[in-house]
Design a protein with these regions (language model features):
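Short, electropositive, low-hydrophobicity segments enriched in small/polar residues
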Residues: 18, 31, 40, 57, ...
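Compact, glycine-rich, soluble single-domain proteins
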Residues: 28-44
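Short beta-strand scaffold segments in enzyme catalytic cores
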Residues: 12-19
C-alpha cells in the first residue's frame, strides 16, 4: 500500500500475488480523477504478473491503510478467478490479524464462457 496513488480517497491498498513457480508480484491501487479509470491493487499485481508471462497463481495477499480487512471488489474477484479459481485470498489488517478465504467462497457463482 506504500506505493499507492490515492489522492482522491486516501484509501491505500497493496497486494502481492504468489505464482505457481514461487515468484511474487506486487501491486497497489492507482486512482484517477475519473474513478472508472482507476485500478485496484489486486488487478495491478495480476496484470504485472501476466505481462511477465505468469498465468498460474496460488494465492494473493491484500492489505490496506484502513482499519479493517479489505476484501477484493467484484471486478478483482472475477479477474482472479480467471487465473486461480482454486486459490486463496489472504487478508491482513493494520493490527496484524489475518483471514484466509478460498476465492470460490468470495465468488461462488463466477462468470465463465
Amino acid at each position: 500500500a506504500q506505493n499507492a496513488y490515492a489522492p482522491y480517497s486516501g484509501f491505500k491498498v497493496g497486494a502481492a500475488i504468489l505464482c505457481r513457480d514461487g515468484s511474487v508480484y506486487t501491486g497497489c491501487n492507482i486512482e484517477n480523477a475519473s474513478y472508472g479509470a482507476s485500478n485496484c491493487a489486486e488487478r495491478t499485481a495480476v496484470f504485472k504478473a501476466v505481462s511477465e508471462g505468469k498465468k498460474e497463481f496460488l494465492k494473493i495477499a491484500i492489505m490496506s491503510s484502513g482499519g479493517g480487512f479489505t476484501f477484493p471488489c467484484g471486478i478483482c474477484r472475477q479477474v482472479l478467478w480467471e487465473f486461480m479459481p482454486q486459490g486463496d485470498v489472504v487478508l491482513g489488517d493494520v493490527n496484524g490479524r489475518i483471514k484466509v478465504f478460498k476465492l470460490k467462497e468470495l465468488l461462488p457463482e463466477a462468470f465463465s464462457l
